[in-house]
């Protein structure tokens, strides 16, 4: 079964109080809503957390189309992470990767799923974003 997942993260102040949200839609249009937050976090941490919580929802391998308005999340998981791992979790400027623990967790979670990552423009009238 294919699932569509919509994730988002936000922060008031950066860092500051933040939250994340997830909508999971199955082929029968049934929706599952997940959300949470942190007292002291960043926008990027909340974006990563939303994706992590969405993928942790599933106990078995799924085909997923994951929509995010975070280029940080999409580019990080599709492009940057390969080099970060090769470089000992350092950026191309030799600085430590920010949010490494979250990236490692996400990287481990994606291994059991078939995921297509879709970037959507934030606050552009897209349902569930």
Predicted feature residues:
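RNase H catalytic domain
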Residues: 10-14, 52-129
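RNase H-like nuclease fold core
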Residues: 1-45, 49, 53-62
